[in-house]
Amino acid sequence: MIIKGSAIPEVNFRKGYEIGDAQEQIDHFAMRITTPVNPFEPEKHGEQRFWYILEGEATVTIDGECTAVGPSDLILIAPWTDHSLRADNWVRWICFG
């Protein structure tokens, strides 16, 4: 699931991302920069992940479906789901889950 930050209204300087029952205890947190020569290659694993785009634009592929993402977008990745991220320029993002 991809939640477009641009579609969420800001109230009192906050945006509420509705993630439903996708709540997880966080045991992984990493800030990454992806570039054309340093793509985030396809992988899958048994843990749910959340990606939050800080700066730049990229293409996220989840189970073969490609979606353009940019600043303030939140990507929810279910366990055992193929996922990757590529950027034509660069993108700074956080991975946690």
PLM regions: where:
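A short, N-terminal "cap"/entry segment at the start of jelly-roll beta-barrel domains
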Residues: 1-33, 40-42
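Short histidine-centered beta-strand/loop micro-motifs
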Residues: 21, 38-45, 62, 86-87
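Short strand-coil-strand connectors
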Residues: 27, 61-65, 88
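Short, surface-exposed secondary-structure edge patches
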Residues: 41, 50, 65-68
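Short, conserved beta-strand element in jelly-roll/cupin
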Residues: 44-60
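A cytosolic small-molecule/anion-sensing beta-strand core signal
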Residues: 54-55, 71, 89
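Short acidic-glycine-tyrosine-enriched beta hairpin
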Residues: 64-79
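Ligand-binding loop in jelly-roll beta-barrel domains
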Residues: 79-97
